[in-house]
C-alpha cells in the first residue's frame, strides 16, 4: 500500500520482487557453478572444552561448495548505504573484516567439520558476504570474500573468552562499567541513555525503587 511504502521506504514486497529478478540475473553464473551443501544451518558449538556451559549458537544462511571443491559460507546482508561511484559505500564493504560475526561463523564451521556435521574432506575457504543494496532507484549486488585465517579465528576465540570472563566478574561484583561507544549506533540510541544522563554514577542508584 502507499502507506507501507512510506513507512518501509525501499523495504517492501514490490522492491523485493524486483531485487530478486536482478539478483538472479547478475549472479546466476555463480549459482550454476556452485553446489549447495546446506541452507539455514543451525549450530551450537562449545567455546571452552573445560566448561560445557559456555557455547556459541547461531544459524548460517548457506553453505556451498565452489568449483574448486572448497567449502564457503554465504552470509546475506542488505544495506541502504549507497555510493554513486561504487554502488556500496566503502565503509559498508570494509565493515566485514574484522567482524565478530564472520569470525564466529568461521569458528563454528571448523567445529562442525571436525564433528563431521559438515564435509570434512573439503578445505574451508571462508565466508562470502552476499550483499544487496536497497535503494529506491538503484540495484546493486556484491559478493565480498572474507578468507579463512586460523590466527584470526584464534584471536576471536580469545576475545570472546575475555568478554565472558569480564561479564562474569561484573555479575559477581555487581560492577558494570559504562560503554559510551554503544550509546548511539546505526540502529538508534540506547533505550537507557536517559538513565545514564540523569544519574551518571550507577553505583549510587538504590536497588529498591523509592516509596
Identify the residue ranges that each predicted region occupies.
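A non-catalytic, helix-rich entry segment at domain boundaries
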Residues: 1-47
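Charge-dense, low-complexity intrinsically disordered segments
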Residues: 3-10, 14, 92, 96, ...
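Structured loop/turn residues at beta-strand edges in well-structured enzyme cores
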Residues: 34, 58, 122
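Metal-dependent nuclease catalytic regions and adjoining charged, substrate-binding loops involved
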Residues: 86, 94-97, 104-211
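Residues embedded in well-ordered secondary-structure elements
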Residues: 28, 51-52, 179
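Non-catalytic protein-protein interaction segments used by genome-maintenance enzymes to assemble
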Residues: 38-114
Amino acid at each position: 500500500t502507499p502507506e507501507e511504502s512510506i513507512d518501509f521506504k525501499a523495504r517492501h514486497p514490490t522492491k523485493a520482487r524486483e531485487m530478486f529478478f536482478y539478483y538472479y540475473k547478475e549472479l546466476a553464473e555463480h549459482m550454476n557453478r556452485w553446489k549447495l551443501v546446506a541452507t539455514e544451518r543451525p549450530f551450537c558449538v562449545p567455546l571452552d572444552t573445560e566448561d560445557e556451559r559456555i557455547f556459541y549458537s547461531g544459524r548460517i544462511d548457506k553453505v556451498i561448495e565452489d568449483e574448486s571443491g572448497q567449502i564457503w559460507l554465504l552470509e546475506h546482508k542488505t544495506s541502504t548505504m549507497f555510493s554513486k561511484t561504487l554502488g556500496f559505500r566503502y565503509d559498508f564493504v570494509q565493515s566485514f573484516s574484522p567482524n565478530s560475526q564472520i569470525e564466529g561463523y568461521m569458528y563454528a564451521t571448523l567445529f562442525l567439520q571436525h564433528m563431521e556435521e559438515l564435509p570434512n574432506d573439503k578445505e574451508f575457504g571462508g565466508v562470502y558476504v552476499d550483499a544487496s543494496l536497497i535503494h529506491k532507484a538503484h540495484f546493486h549486488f556484491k559478493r565480498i570474500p572474507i578468507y579463512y585465517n586460523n590466527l584470526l579465528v584464534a584471536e576471536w576465540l580469545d576475545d570472546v573468552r575475555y568478554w565472558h570472563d569480564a561479564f562474569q566478574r561484573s555479575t559477581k561484583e555487581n560492577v558494570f562499567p559504562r560503554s559510551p561507544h554503544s550509546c548511539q549506533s546505526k540502529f538508534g540510541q540506547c533505550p537507557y541513555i536517559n538513565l545514564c544522563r540523569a544519574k551518571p554514577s550507577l553505583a549510587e542508584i538504590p536497588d529498591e525503587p523509592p516509596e
